[in-house]
Amino acid sequence: LIVMSSCILLGYPVAYFLARYAGRFKYAILLMLIIPLFMSYIIKIYMMRSILGYSGLINKILKMLGIIEKPLEFFLWNQNSVIITLVIILLPLIIIPTFTSLDKIPSNIIEASFDLGCKPFQAFKYVIFPIGFPGLVVGSIFVFILALGDFVTPQLVGGTSGFTFGK
């Protein structure tokens, strides 16, 4: 549930931005989200392992900036690393269906809500979110099922403390 809720919190704003404001770069950004889905799952996990590791990219940057003196253990071989890895790997699976449902909303419906006196938050709450909700549900189901049954990620980045139901 933590992975699914994190994906919703991170993915919905991205999907909304792509659907409403991305302009001519919309499909280029969407393509960048789709391309990692064609990569091997194991390769993505090893990539995350090299980013989150003790000598990984995050720890190197933090040491270079002088924020830390020794590598943080927060990023690898614990439950946090499993959650971070699953969120990053599964994020496109919630962005794409949510984007699709939000992109199909005609702009004249949103304009009509403004003409009828809705403020931007009210238009989002009563028009945009209910129409785009089915895409969010589909993406949430994808993420929940894949995160629930994943057993490779806890083995490769979680160490002995990484736990999911699949393991």
Indicate where each model-derived feature is located:
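Transmembrane alpha-helices
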Residues: 5, 35, 88, 94-107, ...
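The alpha-helix within a helix-turn-helix
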Residues: 113
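Glycine-rich helix-loop "coupling/hinge" segments at transmembrane-helix boundaries
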Residues: 152-167
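Helix-boundary and loop/linker segments of multi-pass membrane transporters
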Residues: 19-23, 68-76, 131
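Transmembrane helix-loop junction
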Residues: 15-20, 50-54, 60, 64, ...
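Membrane-interfacial helix termini and adjacent extracytoplasmic/periplasmic loops
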Residues: 45-87, 121, 157-161
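Transmembrane alpha-helices and adjacent helix-loop boundaries
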Residues: 36-45
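Transmembrane-helix boundary motif in ABC transporter permease subunits
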Residues: 2-34, 50, 108-110, 124, ...
